[in-house]
Each structure stands twice: as C-alpha cells, then as structure tokens.
Amino acid sequence: MKFDIQNDFLGYHSEWNLGSPGGWDYQRITQNIGKAVWDRILRISDPGVDLDFLHPLLYPVYGFVDMLVAVHRSREGTAPGLIAVVAEEETLVDVTENINLAGHLSAVEGITGALMAPHELELCDGKVSYRGQPVSTIFMDFNSDILLDLHRKHDLTPALQAVREGRVVNPRGTEPINVKSMFEVFTGPLGKHFCEETVRRTPWTRRFGERSALGPDGQEIRDLIQYAYRNWDNLVLKPERGYSGMGVRVGGVNEDAGEAIELALSKGDYILQEKIPLNLWAEDNPAVDPVARSVVLERYQTDFRCLMGPGGLFGFLVRFGGVPTNVGSGGGVQPLAVLRSGMTVREAVERVNAAVMNIEYGDLREIVLDQEKMALDERFTYLLGPIRMAIRPRIITPGHLTALERYCRCMWTDSQVLEKMWLEGALDDYIGIEKEELEIARMQPWKGGPAVFASDGLFSFGAHPEDG
C-alpha cells in the first residue's frame, strides 16, 4: 500500500515513559495561549487555513483526570473521597502542573484533590490518610528509585502500604520495564513477540559496554565500543534511566566521541542508539529576533509526546527546540491544531509561516510579549521565566489522529507483553535495577490496569524540511 503522509506519519519514538510522565496539563495551557495568539495573527495576516485548536485530544489532562476519578469510583463507588497528588517536597510550590491537577480533581463532584509530599501521608486506624482523611487513590509524580531514596530518609510506610493496596498510579510494577534498554528487546531476537508498528518505529538500540552485538543491518559487531567510535556521527548515547536530556550525547551535535563514550562507560547503564536524521523531525517556524529587530524563519527540532491510558489516547504534548528538545535543556512548547482545510500539511504550514513572516516586527513582537505575559499569569515558567512557546501551531490532520491512536494501542499492548516477560524472568538480562526497588515493583503489578504512559516521538506529519 502506498504511504499517505496525510493519514500516517514518519519517524520513530526516541523513548517511552511508563513511570510518571508529565505534560498532560501543560498542553492545555499551551493550547489556550496558542489560540489567543492565533486569533491575533488572523486579524493582522490571515493565511486562509482553517485550524481546530479545541479538539479533545489537544487537552490530555481531562482524560487523565477522568481515569483517576474512575480509579476512585472502582474502589469507593459513588462515595466522596480524596485523591492525593504526591510529589517531591521541593517541587510542591513550583510545579504548576501538579498544583493544577489537584484543582482539576477538586472540581469533580465528590472528589477532593490534594497536593502533598510523600512523608505527609499517615496511617489513621490502619488506613492510608492525609490530615486524618482516608486517601482512595494516589498519583505519584516520581519513579520508584526516588521513592526508595526518600524512604531511606523518611519513614514512608504509609506510601508503601498504598503501593501494596494498589492505590498508586502509576502502579510500581511498570518500573522494571520503564528503562530504555527495552528498545533492545524490540530490535533484537525477541522483537517477534511485539506489534510490527512498535518494532518499525523503534531505532536500533543496544545496552552499551564491552560486548558483541548485532548491528542495525543484522551484521555482527564484535566490539560495540569500537563500533561507537567508528560510527559516532550516526549514533546516540543515553542513560538507561533519566530525564530532561541529562547525560545524553548525540553524534554530530556532540562532536567529541571520546568524551561521550568515556562518560557512558564511567557512569554505566547507558544505551547506544541509532540517530534519527535531524531533518525528519525538524520544522521551520517564524520567530522574532530582538537584536536584528526582524521576523526570521528558524529551524527547530520537534518532539511529539503521546499520552495514553487503558482506554486509549489522552492526547499530546508538543515540544520544540534544539537537541534534545526537553524544557530542562532549553526547549519549549508548541500549540497543536487539527487541519480542517482541504490542503496538505506542508501547504498549510507554508501558508501560516508566510502569513506570520508578513507581520511587521513591532506588531509580532507585541504578540510575543503578550504570549509571555499569559504564560506568566498561568505560572507557566521554568527557572523563573516563561517557558518558550512557538508562535505558530504544529499542524496535523484527522487521519494522523487515527494513525496515532493505532500506534498507541500497540504501545499499550506491547507494554503488557513486556511486563509478562519480566514476570516470567525473560528480561532479567536487560534490567539493571536494585533488589529493593524490584521488591517494590512486585508489590503492585500493573497487568494493564490504570496508568498514564508516554511515548516521545521524533515524528513528521508532512512538514519536515526537504533540503536537510
């Protein structure tokens, strides 16, 4: 069947997050601000492109909240109750997303949402409670390695009891398969057990170290370290566990292969991965240049996070920036819109870019300043400043939504296969997690139950540069 870029997408997932992925409320804020910016653009320079900013999948927080409430209802029926949002103490006043989540939960009839540190949980008459009120469900915004570290500093017996009682989302049983080495499972001999969709969107991946391996084309690699030296421009090194792009080294971007390889070997627990061509997950976006006092077209890398639960897609988080694109590494966020006009995504993007480029610098600068003010008003900040936000939306089609729903169903199903293989001992060689953490995982198996998962996609929906 001929590939149709209007109804399918190109690219690969760079990683999965089965632990405690975020972004579900940040995209809501981004959509609201992005729609306000878009309305301003239309009044000045209308590109003649009909875009939908209000599709439910562009607001993933609501599906996430519905899932948490459903978990509560499954335990407590129609009785009112408290859903706890548990986060590290130092983040409680700064992480807007968790503050907002507690508010969204409290807006549901009969539900109280409360944000707290894990050591604020207590046992009252043997029940996991917060300030004397029993807790029905917990969203825990950190992984089990952090839980274990905090338990060693505080007595987190109430939190661990909640794990045993199955009250914690995500279930701690996802943690052993929440490591980047799982991509070697997909791209190695065990790949036959998984969906073709998952396998073809997984870049070649191998745990890094002194070992032999099969290469991207099935060739025998006798010395993986030497292979990395010889082919560095086309490879990436990443910690098996990590976030915000910390410790990642990308061939061709980080040119010193020796530094990258020595870092990976000294730290340990790294993966070696095939680099996805940068142009495939790049797009050109208008921006203001305050130094030159001009409107410029800049090329950014993109990141398309799919957020899902047991019922399917919750929605997306769209990011842009350099390599990597994480906000913690200087990246930003981008609104998302569904194309309703009868044209290709490429034509729509070109029209929107041209319309924005035709706006006078002073007018566009004023729009950007208002955009930043709206971000500050929403406490949408990182290190005290507004999070960077693209001027124009990323554009997809209804056909892309269908393709992404299919892709996420495969990811969910294949995650269940991974957990089953882990419980059977088939993945022991791929998982380097300490014994106590594995014991926590065994307290609360996942088994396909309520959870929020994320896939970070380096995708093209048809607007990637053709000259890169």
Question: Where do the protein language model's features map onto the residues?
Answer:
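Preference for protein termini
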Residues: M1-G468
